[in-house]
């Protein structure tokens, strides 16, 4: 993690409260679109198919780490945000380091490095339920409990969520659940912090960007209000 006026690299830090304020029914990457050097879009796809570019470089040339662990695909360097749909509710801070990095990870960080933290010690104590609704049948329910740091330096965080939406056109429907558990320990007077996190995001979603082929219209398209098969047509 870069430090201001210490690490010689251009970076921007976004707190979890800022992300929570911007979230609404947006995906995680879309909450970062106002960060300098960052461009995001949904690639005409379904839920979780968003893309993020840092200084013009896509997934394959940008390193993504969550709690210090690389999450880019080991074969092609891509990252599938549909596997991290609950990240927007768990993030305590995000740091975007722009430009060529010196990371020793397998992914070449020509565009930069995006570091996401979900540390339990950085979350304010509290318990609550959040509900959100949007257009096209989107709704989301989230329940959470954060203990904060106690006198012994221990902290924990729990979260359970559910979301569903139809999307703004055919082929964008999706549904999923999110669960997370995190335990942290910060020794008194120490310079280190220990954190254990368990994150899951079971989901399914349609992928509209594959499109519909001409043959699909010939085989299944409506003809005078009826479905017809091209093989039966003269």
Residue ranges and their predicted role:
Residues 1-21, 59:
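Short, acidic, small-residue-rich periplasmic hinge/interaction motif at the N-terminus
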Residues 30, 53, 95, 113-115, ...:
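Outer-membrane beta-barrel architecture
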């Amino acid at each position: 993690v870069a430090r201001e006026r210490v690490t010689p690299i251009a970076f921007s830090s976004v707190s979890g409260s800022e992300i929570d304020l911007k979230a609404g029914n947006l995906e995680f990457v879309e909450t970062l679109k106002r960060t300098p050097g960052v461009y995001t879009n949904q690639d005409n796809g379904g839920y979780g198919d968003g893309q993020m570019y840092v200084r013009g470089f896509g997934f394959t040339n940008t390193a993504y780490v969550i709690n210090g662990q690389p999450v880019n695909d080991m074969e092609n360097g891509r990252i599938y945000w549909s596997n991290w749909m609950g990240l927007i509710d768990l993030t305590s801070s995000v740091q975007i380091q722009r430009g060529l990095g010196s990371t020793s990870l397998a992914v070449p960080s020509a565009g930069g490095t995006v570091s996401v933290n979900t540390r339990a010690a950085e979350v304010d104590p509290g318990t609550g339920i959040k509900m959100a609704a949007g257009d096209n049948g989107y709704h989301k329910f989230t329940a959470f409990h954060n203990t904060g740091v106690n006198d012994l330096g221990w902290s924990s965080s729990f979260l359970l969520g559910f979301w569903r939406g139809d999307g703004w056109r055919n082929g964008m429907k999706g549904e999923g659940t999110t669960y997370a558990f995190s335990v942290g320990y910060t020794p008194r007077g120490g310079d280190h912090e220990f954190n254990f996190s368990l994150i899951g995001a079971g989901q399914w979603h349609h992928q509209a960007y594959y499109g519909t082929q001409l043959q699909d219209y010939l085989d299944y398209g409506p003809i005078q209000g009826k479905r017809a098969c091209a093989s039966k047509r003269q």
